[in-house]
Amino acid sequence: VTVFLAVILVMLIGSFSCSKGDYSGKVETVAIGATPIELNALIYVADEYRFFTNNGVQVVFKDYDTGVAAVDGLLKREVDMALTTEFVIVGKSLQKQDVLDLATIDKSMLFYIIARTDRGIKTTADLKGKRIGVPRQTITGFYLGRMLELNGMRIQQVTTVDTKASDPAGTIAGGDVDAIVTWEPQVTQIRQQMGNGVIIWPAQSGQVSFWSIASTPRWINQHPDLVRQLLKSLAQAEEYIIQHPAEAKKILQRRLKLDDTYIATVWSQNQFLLSLDQSLILAMEDEGRWMIKNNLTREKQIPDFMNYIYVDGLKAVKPEAVKIIR
């Protein structure tokens, strides 16, 4: 009986992964630049259950420390696509660099400000005059600036220090900075290592971060069918996560070597859904104005961010997920 049930289970899994996208054409390779974090859940599930290959896509991964590093790799043609925040796409648009957002694959609330209590920091007001670590050109600088503004301060009233995104725990534990802005799972790691030696605040001030899959106009124009095939695979992964959250969590745990407690904590802080909606545009405009206000660009006006979003791919695969007002 046990053997019979096991065979049935294998058949059901195989049916789920194959019936969604039987593909008899040429399988093409797509190189994706990514930071290995749980925000990539749709990507990892699609890879694990062969949704990519069943739709004619062979995905290979190249790891980067940050989304901005992944996009820089994209622009250097090291990869075909990059996973990044909308903030990076905003920055590239203000630099007149061609990067298009294909779809949001996750909305999250995973960024935090972590401060050392032995530096006299008990409230956010105590951050004034302190050295705060933020990885260069990432969305952490925006979140820090916004949080300071909401607490009556300006980012010029702190000293920002360009820190390595790969080792925030070492940076704050080593005492090079008084505080740091970082994201999960590093936040949990620092909390476990330093305990009461740090105080932690949410950094995003209620604004979700959009984790996007991006590419260049050149590559998209050369591979429109491949874009649709990849997004179709992610739509199938989204359906799988909705129907089988426990199995999806196990995939993340195996892939990223995460424990049960961590996954249980952060799962609800993510929305693993494909989308292109108006809230993305509003966030990009807000971030663009912030960059201009803080002289992080030579531009004086924000661009039309619709010019940096490619809607045709997602419209073809999941039209109800496109909710942008033109």
Language model features: what each stretch is:
Residues 41-45, 49-50, 72, 76, ...:
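Solvent-exposed, polar/charged alpha-helical surfaces in well-ordered, non-transmembrane soluble domains
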Residues 1-29, 319-326:
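Short, low-complexity disordered leader/linker segments with a strong preference
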Residues 292-326:
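Conserved C-terminal helix/tail region of periplasmic/extracytoplasmic solute-binding proteins
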Residues 138-154, 232-264, 303-306, 316-320:
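Ligand-binding clefts/hinges and TM-proximal coupling segments of bilobed small-molecule sensing domains
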Residues 87, 157-161, 166-254:
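Pocket-lining segment of extracytoplasmic ligand-binding domains
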Residues 221-298:
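Secondary-structure end/capping motifs
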Residues 79-83, 174, 270-286, 313-322:
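Short amphipathic alpha-helical segments at helix boundaries and their inter-helical linkers
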Residues 23-164, 178-184, 198-207:
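Short, glycine-/small- and polar/acidic-enriched structural segments
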